[in-house]
């Protein structure tokens, strides 16, 4: 008998994959390399982890191509915090172009992959890969893995709970 449900489509993303700065914005970071290369500028290791998941599950990885200190791809297009202080002084047109070129293109790629997944093999599971540093204060210092879910989404909470249970069973020494 068994479970006849189709395998869900996995959509992988990594918003804070790099700390790259396009040539035309480099002057803004000339005295801020430490900030740019810190966890404030990107999620070190997240791109490698996302690529490993993509290879393991034979699915593409959608990832950011610029530092979150220019525009944070993890924030909504209307969130005023999506732009950092490093873009202060740019005109509205410049900010709109940056948003369209980076955030808009990124979100459109994700939408296309999710829509395609819904048509091919629903349901779709979207996994966004991040890393946290102890300095961020976002996780307890001795934490190895964090699985986040949005409380208002019951299926997401169930999947996250099952994943945590499976990880604890497979690797009881990890702090999850």
Model-derived segments and their meaning:
Residues 1-176:
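N-terminal catalytic or cofactor-binding beta/alpha core of small enzyme domains
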